[in-house]
Design a protein with these regions (language model features):
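Carbohydrate-active catalytic/glycan-binding domains of CAZyme proteins
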Residues: 1-318
Length: 318
């Protein structure tokens, strides 16, 4: 298996915001943003390497008008409470930047052939007046100590928009139980290139710690990854439980021709070794708006652990 996989080079072309989930039956599932931003696709394979050439199935298409009719972004596939869920963001043809988080549900065994039901916009907690009122996207879900948490990016501010990361405990797969808690804002210069951005959260657990990676800055060569860390026994809804890295944990490497790495997810290979799935570009210069340039490619990276700190090591060295 390891000989078939090539790391830190284009793996699945023109698939941004890549997400890989290994189900309990051993199968791997892949989804991502596609260049047209008009549908949600899934792939399945018995091996991680097999996802590259696996058949791609469209399981949902954007609406012709109204909500969920433009900018279908960053889908993630999760299996919760015996059902499949896809979390994604979408806009409105009449207001393309009215990006909000939405949920699809599938009660069938096979998510590629089963019927998907729209659960609508992600529901906020009853006491929450603010979540998902503004530009909101890039949601992920993770479990800790029997509780499920929802982490997403949302813009705030008038004039200079700032994209922060928020967290909430989930009541159901499509509604929050708690009011939003601010996890991180773009505090540092490397998070403020072009736009002030924290987005694309992803979570990996190791040795009693929770590592939450995220992406920062505009989507060109300046795009990079930061990280937060919390103890799994701490109160994850207390911002003080999280420690933020001062510098990016992964960024452009011109010598390797890897530009703007980010919006990652975590999975494992067939031997159970952790693997990061991320997107990056292979060219430094981009014509036009980087958002609409299709050449963000899904790539793979082996994850190793720092023996002293216990933290993940993000390295382009195979």
């Amino acid at each position: 298996m390891s000989e078939e996989l090539k790391y830190n080079e284009p793996w699945i072309l023109q698939r941004a915001d890549p997400y890989v989930y290994r189900h309990t039956d051993g199968n791997y599932y892949f989804t991502a943003s596609i260049p047209a931003y008009d549908r949600i696709v899934l792939r399945r394979s018995e091996t991680l390497a097999g996802l590259k050439d696996a058949e791609e199935v469209t399981v949902w298409e954007k609406h012709k008008e109204g909500i969920m009719s433009e900018h279908i972004w960053a889908p993630e596939l999760h299996y919760l409470d015996g059902k499949w869920y896809i979390y994604f963001a979408g806009g409105d043809k009449d207001d393309i930047w009215a990006i909000r988080p939405y949920v699809l549900e599938c009660a069938d065994t096979d998510p590629l052939t089963g019927a998907w039901t729209e659960k609508g916009k992600m529901g906020r907690a009853d006491a929450d007046e603010f979540s998902f009122e503004a530009f909101s996207l890039d949601a992920t879900v993770f479990e800790n100590k029997g509780k499920h948490y929802y982490v997403w990016a949302e813009k705030v501010g008038v004039g200079k928009q700032i994209s922060n990361l928020y967290i909430g405990e989930m009541e159901t797969p499509y509604k929050l139980k708690t009011v939003q808690v601010l996890l991180t804002s773009p505090d540092y210069d490397w998070e403020r290139v072009g736009f002030w951005v924290n987005e694309g959260p992803a979570v990996i657990h190791h040795d009693g710690r929770i590592y939450l990676t995220y992406s920062a800055s505009e989507t060109g060569a300046a795009y990079c990854m930061g990280m937060l860390t919390a103890d799994e026994d701490s109160d994850l809804l207390d911002p003080k439980s999280w420690t933020k890295e001062r510098y990016p944990v992964l960024r452009t490497d011109e010598s390797r021709g890897i530009y703007g790495p980010g919006h990652n997810s975590f999975t494992e290979d067939e031997e159970g070794n952790p693997v990061m799935v991320y997107h990056a570009r292979t060219e430094a210069e981009i014509e036009g708006n980087p958002l609409y340039n299709p050449n963000r490619h899904a790539m793979l990276m082996k994850i190793r652990w720092d023996e002293k700190k216990g933290a993940p090591i993000f390295s382009y060295e195979d």
